[in-house]
């Protein structure tokens, strides 16, 4: 049936990712594991859960990183530069005209060389010639800047970033919730896979005992036929018919033995144990496994189911994240304002005539950035984010519809499994009675060998169907608990 195929797929996919990372309980050859112990082993040793715990931790760090954007950023930058040449303010020595105080004019005037005959200023190349000059050598304004050290300590405090910082903090908060939800959902998947593997082993162990009983029946029948041949009331053909059935039953028993070994290996791997670990399960060999409690006929509150489903919670968080991404895109169309401050210094410094010592100054200001025109790029980015948000909402609605269908299917399968279990119990009693009647009739000579083998085949089929029905009740109940979000288990400390 489809459910059993899904169960086997879950076992195989989950067993690939399970391995032992923490020392668990010591498992000896005489150890008996309950289903709760198998769950605990798997939850403590599953690789996917370990990875999910690290993702939760990383999401927490990213949330702290986003919060830091509210606070001022303090940075230091420094450097060294070698210059090949000195810096000079003049290309040569300079002669600067000077002024003297004129008593008549009550002010400073340039002393100009005048012609003693005419009293007119003497000019050279059209420029008057001063009587006195100040000599300013080139070296006086040349500075040794071969080795320059510089640095600055800066502070940047965001004041208004268009809502980007607020949106990023919400995104990282939702991302942390999303990582936790994924971890819980993965734990639920692991528990479901372990339960499926557990009951698979129990089922095969019961079928192994059934196959052995069937072999014993045929072996006993073969011995009876051999005695009847000696007495002349049976033929060689009857003996061969029984022997063929016996060999076929032994082949089936071998297949069941191999399947049981492989199923134990799959369960051991899920539990994080070496695959060759020898252990028994608490429900192995139980004559009557108590069926799970029958659920009431009260209607299922789908809103409660939605609230308990981690996968649906992930989609809801995805919608919120995309909403905030749209806000981030919108912030790029809004002005950004930040307060900036700095202390800069250098050696040689410009405050003391380029002396070779450190000196610096403080500076404070504000920086405003206003996007003016980007040819619609930012606006299209915002519209794309809004479209992605709507697409995520549609995916969320579709998921709710699929969950409705999934819950109904699981409920029907659970009810079907219970009805099948009741019918197999009736068939089992009839098959046992039929086999007993056939054995008695064959011993009294009123039943043929074919009648006995038909009764044995019907007995085998009835017992096999009963085993499948009992296990299906558990598998369907676990699956229904999973889709309802009520699969109970104790989550280990994975988020440390």
Question: Which residues does each predicted region cover?
Answer:
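Acidic, low-complexity, intrinsically disordered peripheral segments
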Residues: 4, 19-27, 75, 82-109, ...
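Bacterial Sec-pathway N-terminal export signals of envelope proteins
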Residues: 20-88, 275, 281-320, 371-372, ...
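Amphipathic alpha-helical coiled-coil scaffold segments and their short linker/junction regions
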Residues: 39-43, 95-138, 273-340, 489-496
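Small/polar (Gly/Ser/Thr/Ala-rich) solvent-exposed segments
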Residues: 50, 74-88, 138-146, 156-185, ...
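Amphipathic alpha-helical coiled-coil segments
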Residues: 51-66, 186, 192-209, 227, ...
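Periplasmic alpha-helical coiled-coil/stalk elements that build and connect Gram-negative outer-membrane
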Residues: 61, 181-304, 413, 417, ...
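Residues on the lipid-exposed face of transmembrane beta-strands in outer-membrane beta-barrel proteins
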Residues: 80, 153-157, 267, 343, ...
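Hydrophobic, lipid-facing positions within transmembrane beta-strands of outer-membrane proteins
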Residues: 149-155, 301, 362-368, 410
């Amino acid at each position: 049936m489809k459910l059993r195929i899904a169960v086997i797929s879950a076992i195989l996919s989950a067993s690939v990712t399970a391995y032992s990372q923490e020392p668990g309980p010591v498992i000896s050859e005489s150890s008996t594991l309950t289903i709760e112990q198998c769950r605990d082993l798997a939850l403590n040793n599953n690789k996917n859960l370990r990875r999910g715990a690290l993702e939760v931790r990383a999401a927490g760090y990213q949330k702290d990183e986003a919060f830091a954007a509210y606070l001022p950023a303090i940075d230091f930058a420094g450097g060294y530069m070698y210059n090949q040449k000195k810096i000079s303010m003049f290309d040569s020595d300079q002669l600067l005209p000077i002024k003297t105080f004129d008593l008549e004019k009550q002010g400073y005037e340039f002393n100009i060389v005048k012609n003693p005959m005419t009293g007119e200023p003497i000019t050279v190349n059209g420029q008057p010639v001063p009587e006195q000059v100040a000599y300013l050598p080139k070296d006086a304004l040349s500075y040794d800047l071969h080795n320059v050290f510089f640095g600055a300590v800066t502070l940047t405090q965001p004041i208004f970033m268009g809502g980007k910082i607020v949106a990023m903090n919400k995104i990282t908060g939702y991302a942390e919730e999303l990582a936790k939800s994924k971890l819980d959902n993965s734990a639920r998947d692991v528990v479901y896979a372990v339960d499926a593997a557990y009951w698979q082993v129990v089922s095969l162990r019961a079928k192994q005992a059934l196959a052995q009983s069937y072999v014993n029946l045929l072996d006993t029948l073969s011995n009876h036929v051999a005695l009847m041949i000696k007495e002349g009331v049976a033929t060689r053909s009857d003996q061969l018919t029984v022997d063929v059935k016996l060999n076929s039953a032994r082949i089936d028993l071998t297949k069941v033995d191999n399947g049981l070994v492989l199923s134990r290996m799959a369960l051991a791997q899920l539990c994080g144990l070496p695959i060759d670990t020898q252990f028994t399960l608490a429900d192995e060999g139980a004559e009557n496994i108590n069926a799970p409690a029958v659920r009431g006929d009260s209607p299922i509150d789908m809103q409660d189911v939605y609230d308990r489903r981690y996968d649906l919670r992930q989609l809801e968080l995805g919608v919120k994240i995309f909403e905030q991404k749209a806000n981030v895109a919108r912030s790029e169309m809004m002005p950004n304002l930040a307060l900036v401050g700095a202390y800069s210094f250098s050696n040689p410094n410009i405050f003391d005539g380029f002396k070779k010592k450190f000196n610096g100054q403080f500076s404070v200001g504000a920086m405003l950035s206003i996007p003016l025109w980007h040819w619609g790029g930012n606006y299209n980015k915002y519209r794309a984010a809004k479209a992605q948000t709507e697409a995520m909402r549609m995916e969320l609605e579709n998921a709710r519809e699929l969950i409705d269908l999934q819950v109904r299917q699981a409920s029907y399968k659970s009810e079907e499994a219970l009805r099948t279990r009741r019918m197999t119990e009736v068939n089992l009693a009839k098959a046992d009675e039929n086999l007993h009647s056939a054995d008695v009739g064959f011993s009294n000579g009123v039943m043929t060998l074919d009648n006995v083998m038909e009764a044995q085949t019907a007995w085998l089929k009835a017992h096999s169907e009963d085993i499948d029905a009992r296990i299906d009740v558990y598998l369907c109940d676990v699956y229904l608990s999973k889709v309802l979000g009520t699969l109970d288990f104790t989550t280990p400390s994975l988020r440390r």
